[in-house]
């Protein structure tokens, strides 16, 4: 067994940035990643099934996705679900790429608002690291945003903001509210060996072009060529420590289920704000009975998830193809990102504008029910490409009751306790969500929306705060450089170390902190104590919970084709229902005319094998019933099946113009029309 200079657990954003810095310094690096590589051709991309797959095996929720590499997350005691991705690239594979830095005051919440704590570092100390990771990820945007100190200038020009972005920008110029062309980790032109964005609108299910800055593309391929050893299918069970209390490596299980051990002088955790506390708590020893690095009792506590609200505005007269813009953000607003006591709550939210999605989302908007029968075609045509969507990212404060613990009833497929999330939105958060929803409605009405609708977000992937940094070991888990107070050669570089959440998407800050921590370790490596690898390893603590009920995630592969059980009677019944739900119009065919009860429902079920049993059961228990005679659940299942199959029809796609291939690359706005129109003048003049 070879001892690595550094062992990194997790191959997402923070692990990649840290690995690059260690490799640049000539250190030997081993990375253990429990997922696998995903080839770009496996992503849904421009396939008509993309929206369906995003709700199934390409969901950002591990509990829905259920891949063999995933670990389940118990969120039954949480107001929000938790999103992640297990594989090379981590969450960057499925994130939308909106790339914002935290604001200077986000690091000084105690000083500014008298709540939570200040960070043990400032924006100024992080700025050079922000700049460096912007270059690594290929960030596009427009410099000069007055909400930031000078120097926050992206290395590539901004992506187009489109007709919808321009409408809302004009409204904010008239209202006197801040707006700015969005900053995204998405390339507008060929660079860094990557192709430019082609505006597929499917960033959230993997970028087929490599334009989005996911670390499987931006970092890991190059790092492997340079000698970094990246082991996939490696599920880490425990961080090992020696008798002196120093980290000496990790125990892990390979693809076959065999136990392995990797020794290292330094261990770096890059497992996200749920995975890292889970691993620390599972690594309890007799010397660390409450979990590794947990003498403060803070491991897993103060979880922050960025509760999100959404507001849709429906407009008239825009092009149906407008929904296909990149999914990062078109524009963003920080008008209300700071605190104002007159609002009745502390802290604020950042707004990010995008389109409201494709035909399936249009069909079921605004309430998850949609419109059916003769009204269906007008309903979809009035929304597809004609809706703008404000995502309101609210800052939640760190609260001890919001936490991650080890489940006593749920394990992953190797028997390791799952993470159990306890999270409740506070009164402050609820007031913030309601207030920002009203302001976002005002914004879209000012932009000319003929209808505005509030949307609930049930989950988020911004996982922060569960191993917070600080200078006092009694009140923090790691020091300002990410080194654990209790285990000085154990370093945490993911969102766990956040002291407060800010309201910016956290990936930029996570990456900058990871680079800062890795750079500090490289510069001071001689001062880092090392374990005596010839000595004995501390045994696990016997009180580490072992769940009584083992639950294994479903295994999903892109090639899996379910066995269908639709009889001819089932298909006849579905055909009758289909033409009631989506009849013909002067411009659109009926569902039955394009093959919904035949080959299209087969394509639908191939994309969503998890829905086969429910559809078969519903068809058989409603046989002979008209739609109006069915219960709500039956109507829901059948509407989804009919619409899901209908919008897979190439003829329907052609008539609605929601899939016009081939797509040309975007043309970056080197001198955008909104500059010529003066839409930024009031922002810059304030």
What does each model-identified segment do?
Residues 36, 68-69, 266, 270-386, ...:
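Mid-to-C-terminal "cap/lid" subdomains and adjacent gly/pro-rich loops that border
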Residues 1-111, 115, 120-131, 234, ...:
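N-terminal glycine-rich phosphate/pyrophosphate-binding loop and immediately adjacent elements
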Residues 553-560, 573-576, 588-591, 595-606, ...:
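Mature-region segments of soluble proteins
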Residues 140-148, 182-184, 451-454, 585-593, ...:
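Surface-exposed patches in mature extracellular/periplasmic domains of secreted proteins
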Residues 543-586:
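N-terminal leader/targeting peptides and immediately adjacent processing regions
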Residues 181-203, 210, 237-241, 385-396, ...:
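A glycine-rich dinucleotide-binding beta-alpha-beta segment and adjacent secondary-structure elements
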Residues 55, 59, 70-77, 98, ...:
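Conserved redox-cofactor binding core of oxidoreductases
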Residues 21-24, 28, 35-47, 209, ...:
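Glycine-rich loop(s) and the adjacent beta-strand/alpha-helix scaffold that form part
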């Amino acid at each position: 067994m070879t001892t690595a200079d550094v062992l990194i657990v997790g191959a997402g954003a923070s692990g990649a940035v840290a690995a690059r810095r260690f490799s640049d310094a000539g250190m030997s690096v081993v990375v253990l990643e429990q997922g696998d590589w995903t080839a770009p051709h496996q992503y849904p991309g421009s396939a008509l099934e993309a929206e369906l797959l995003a709700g199934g095996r390409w969901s950002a929720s591990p509990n829905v996705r259920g891949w063999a590499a995933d670990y389940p997350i118990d969120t039954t005691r949480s107001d929000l679900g938790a999103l992640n991705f297990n594989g090379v690239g981590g969450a960057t594979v499925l994130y939308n790429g909106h790339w914002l830095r935290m604001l200077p005051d986000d690091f000084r919440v105690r000083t500014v608002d008298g709540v939570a704590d200040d960070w043990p570092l400032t924006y100024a100390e992080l700025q050079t690291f922000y700049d460096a990771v912007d270059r690594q990820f290929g960030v596009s945007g427009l410099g000069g945003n007055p909400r930031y100190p000078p120097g926050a200038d992206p290395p590539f020009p901004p992506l187009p903001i489109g007709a919808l972005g321009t409408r809302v920008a004009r409204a904010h110029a008239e209202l006197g509210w801040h707006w700015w062309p969005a900053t995204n980790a998405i390339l507008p032109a060929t660079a860094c060996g990557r192709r430019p964005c082609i505006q597929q609108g499917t960033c959230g299910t993997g970028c087929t072009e490599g334009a989005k800055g996911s670390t499987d593309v931006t970092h890991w391929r190059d790092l492997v060529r340079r000698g970094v050893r990246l082991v996939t299918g490696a599920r880490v069970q425990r961080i090992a420590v020696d008798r002196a209390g120093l980290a000496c490596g990790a125990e892990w299980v390979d693809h076959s289920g065999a136990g392995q051990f990797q020794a290292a002088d330094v261990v770096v955790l890059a497992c996200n704000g749920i995975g890292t506390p889970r691993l620390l708590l599972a690594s309890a020893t007799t010397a660390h009975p409450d979990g590794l690095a947990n003498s403060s009792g803070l491991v897993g506590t103060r979880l922050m998830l960025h509760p999100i609200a959404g507001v849709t505005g429906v407009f008239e007269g825009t092009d149906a193809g407008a929904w296909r813009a990149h999914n990062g953000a078109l524009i963003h607003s920080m008008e209300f990102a700071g605190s104002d006591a007159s609002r009745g709550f502390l802290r604020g939210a950042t707004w990010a504008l995008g389109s409201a999605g494709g035909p399936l989302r249009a069909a079921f908007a605004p309430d998850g029910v949609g419109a059916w029968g003769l009204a269906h075609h007008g309903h979809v045509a009035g929304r597809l490409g004609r809706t703008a969507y404000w995502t309101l990212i609210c800052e939640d404060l760190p609260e001890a009751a919001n936490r991650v613990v080890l489940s006593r009833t749920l394990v992953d497929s190797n028997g390791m306790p799952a993470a159990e999330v306890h999270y409740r939105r506070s009164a402050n958060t609820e007031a913030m969500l309601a207030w920002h929803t009203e302001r976002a409605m005002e914004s879209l009405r000012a932009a000319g929306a003929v209808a505005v609708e509030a949307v609930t977000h049930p989950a988020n992937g911004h996982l922060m705060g569960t191993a917070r940094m600080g200078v006092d070991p009694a009140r923090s888990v790691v020091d300002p450089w990410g080194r654990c107070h209790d285990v000085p050669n154990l370093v945490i570089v993911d969102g766990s170390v956040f002291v407060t959440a800010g309201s910016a998407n956290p990936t930029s800050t996570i990456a900058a902190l990871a680079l800062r921590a890795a750079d500090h370790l490289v510069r001071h490596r001689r001062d880092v104590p090392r374990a005596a690898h010839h000595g004995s390893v501390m045994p696990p603590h016997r009180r580490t919970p072992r769940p009584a009920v083992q639950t294994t995630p479903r295994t999903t592969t892109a090639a899996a084709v379910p066995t269908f059980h639709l009889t001819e009677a089932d298909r006849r019944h579905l055909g009758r229902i289909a033409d009631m739900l989506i009849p013909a119009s002067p411009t659109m065919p009926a569902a039955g005319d394009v093959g919904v009860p035949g080959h299209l429902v087969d394509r639908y079920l191939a994309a969503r094998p998890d829905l086969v049993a429910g559809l078969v059961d519903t068809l058989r228990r409603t046989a002979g019933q008209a739609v109006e005679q069915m219960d709500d659940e039956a109507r829901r299942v059948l509407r989804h099946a009919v619409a899901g199959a209908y919008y897979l029809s190439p003829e329907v796609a052609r008539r609605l113009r929601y899939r016009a291939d081939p797509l040309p690359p975007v043309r970056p706005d080197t001198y955008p029309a909104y500059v010529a129109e003066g839409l930024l003048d009031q922002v810059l003049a304030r």
